């Protein structure tokens, strides 16, 4: 499974921290990717700069936005990137109610906001949930996820 989060390609990174104990080489400084203008072309350039092409069936997790809302990445901005990796936009229904609490309404919101015009949209918990083991987890031994995660 390979998932791409659009936030993972934006120009943010955490600084490298050295050990307070010393005694080892400092970790390599992280690469920082920066573009002055956030454009469809620059979204693709940032992705390509990672030099880690996505292979297999790829899921892009982003918010398709609440019905009538405006707090989501515009499809025109991400279309070229989403289509470059030939993938599917994925989300889960909301647990807090609202206009994306049911799969039917969620898909309508995705269509109304233009996401279904640029890529397939898969509501991960449309067919229920599945339980996946967490290997060597500190707090959890299993996680409940939308069943469609098994398709990726």
Predicted regions and their residues:
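N-terminal and secondary-structure boundary signal
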Residues: 2, 6, 17-152
